């Protein structure tokens, strides 16, 4: 069974982090960002991502509504209807279904924008100007030893605290960069959109892991 790990890499932005003396400016930026996104009932985003050393740039999109989400990227679709998670792999036309078990450390893509900052070591890095817009850059790193992530650097619009991009550096120094191309708040979406519908994938092989 071929495994894909992009979803987990994408969501490692909200892995378990430890507590250190914190940068108050970075903390205030995080608070403002979270206040913005937590007021939304739902949202949709399209993004590009790539790995340092590779010229390949891939595209993806995500729709989130509460704990429900649907992520399309890297030849796969991930559905979470709040009860179960279905990962569809296009190349092999198979879907893996497992129970959704939320926890404090759940790698829910909704938390890319609303992660709990408790336990994070966060610092303000710099302010930069791109295309006439001012952006604030903050960096988060884990206290817990042995995690796959070394640090996460997030770039936010200074004016409205929207996330522009983030860079994940793993323990081996490899970096993945994600850039938000379009963000739509409060999208109208039915709950059925987050459930895998077998009838729409003729001949799909179902691997029930529950």
Feature-to-residue mapping (PLM):
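Gly/Pro-enriched, hydrophobic low-complexity segments
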Residues: 120-202, 206-209
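Flexible, surface-exposed loop/linker segments and immediately adjacent secondary-structure boundaries
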Residues: 100-134
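Short hydrophobic/aromatic-rich beta-strand segments that constitute the beta-sheet cores
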Residues: 45-47, 69-73, 85-88, 97, ...
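N-terminal leader/targeting segments and the immediate start of mature chains
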Residues: 17-55, 67-68, 200, 205-210
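Bacterial N-terminal signal peptides that target proteins for export
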Residues: 1-7
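Bacterial N-terminal signal peptides
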Residues: 8-16
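An acidic-aromatic
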Residues: 59-107, 176
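Solvent-exposed loop/turn segments connecting transmembrane beta-strands
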Residues: 52-55, 76, 173
């Amino acid at each position: 069974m071929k495994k894909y790990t992009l979803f987990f890499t994408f969501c490692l932005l909200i892995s378990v982090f430890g507590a250190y003396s914190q940068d108050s400016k970075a903390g205030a930026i995080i608070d403002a960002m979270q206040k913005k996104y937590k007021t939304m009932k739902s949202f949709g985003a399209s993004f590009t991502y790539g790995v340092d050393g590779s010229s390949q740039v891939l595209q993806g999109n995500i729709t989130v509504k509460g704990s429900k989400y649907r992520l399309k990227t890297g030849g796969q679709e991930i559905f979470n209807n709040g009860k179960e998670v279905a990962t569809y792999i296009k190349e092999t036309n198979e879907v893996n279904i497992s129970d959704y078990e939320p926890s404090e450390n759940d790698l829910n893509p909704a938390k890319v924008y609303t992660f709990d900052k408790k336990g994070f070591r966060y610092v303000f890095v710099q302010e930069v100007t791109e295309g006439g817009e001012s952006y604030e850059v903050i960096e988060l790193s884990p206290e817990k030893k042995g995690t796959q992530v070394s640090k996460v650097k997030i770039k936010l619009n200074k004016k409205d605290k929207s996330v522009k991009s983030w860079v994940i550096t793993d323990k081996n120094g490899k970096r993945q960069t994600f850039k938000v191309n379009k963000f739509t708040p409060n999208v109208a979406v039915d709950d059925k959109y987050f459930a895998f519908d077998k009838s729409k994938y003729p001949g799909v092989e179902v691997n029930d892991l529950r």
